[in-house]
């Protein structure tokens, strides 16, 4: 940034708060950013969609860097769509255009991300080309198809796999982990081990912990009257639930 190397000490963030779900007020946004800054976090990934416009204004105000990500994900069907299928090309490009045209003047944004876990193929080559033509000043990112973007991005790679990149014959791109140190339960205990590697060589540029806040809803226990944060199958629906995969945050829902 501005000619100086930047180590990304980042976190992925869903728009969420424990009392109102995905309706996040400006006060909560400010609290999020202040907590991030207090904990030495300097960048946030808008996983996995462009965020409320106010969020970017606050990131500009506080000095928090942003990887802005298009709302493109085909997690459950990435073996089929969009890949090279021309009928999906307009939708893929439309998502890039909507992201860039809305937020291109936000100084906090340092990187455009094509999407998340959405297969590979010609459509992503076209998306990367579109982003570079519209804004050659910012980096491009897409983890599944690293050859078309400016970054060599991975998810949840081990320390040994990170070290292997040092001897990889085509290691010309900056290496980052767009998701790592999955914050589920009693985890993230070996974070210092990761940072020892990241700080050992200039080719490593940090990463984004998964993720910022537990996606849980403030609920009253009908038996005790006490407040607790419910998630997963707490409402009795065991078939259609993410179970504890919704509680991966570094911080609680409140």
Feature map (PLM): residue ranges:
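Substrate-binding/catalytic cleft of secreted carbohydrate-active enzymes
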Residues: 33-36, 43-253
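N-terminal carbohydrate-binding accessory modules
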Residues: 1-38, 57
């Amino acid at each position: 940034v501005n000619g100086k190397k930047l180590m990304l000490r980042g976190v992925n963030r869903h728009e969420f708060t424990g009392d109102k779900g995905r309706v996040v007020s400006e006060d909560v946004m400010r609290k999020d950013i202040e907590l991030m800054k207090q904990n030495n976090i300097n960048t946030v990934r808008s996983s996995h969609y462009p965020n409320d416009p106010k969020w970017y204004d606050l990131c500009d105000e506080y000095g928090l860097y942003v990887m802005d990500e298009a709302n493109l994900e085909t997690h459950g069907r990435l073996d089929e769509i969009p890949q090279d299928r021309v009928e999906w090309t307009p939708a893929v490009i439309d998502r890039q255009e909507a992201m860039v045209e809305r937020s291109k003047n936000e100084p906090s944004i340092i990187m455009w991300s094509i999407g998340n876990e959405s297969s590979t193929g010609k459509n992503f080559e076209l998306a990367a080309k579109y982003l570079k033509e519209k804004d050659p000043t910012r980096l491009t990112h897409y983890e599944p198809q690293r050859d078309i973007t400016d970054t060599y991005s991975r998810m949840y790679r081990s320390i040994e796999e990170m070290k292997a990149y040092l001897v990889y014959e085509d290691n010309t791109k900056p290496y980052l982990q767009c998701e790592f140190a999955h914050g589920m339960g009693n985890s993230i205990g070996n974070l210092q081990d990761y940072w020892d590697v990241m700080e050992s060589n200039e080719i490593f540029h940090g990463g984004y912990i998964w993720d910022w806040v537990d996606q849980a809803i403030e609920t009253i226990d009908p038996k005790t009257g006490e407040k607790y944060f419910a998630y997963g199958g707490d409402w009795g629906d065991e078939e259609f639930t993410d179970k504890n995969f919704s509680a991966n945050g570094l911080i609680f829902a409140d």
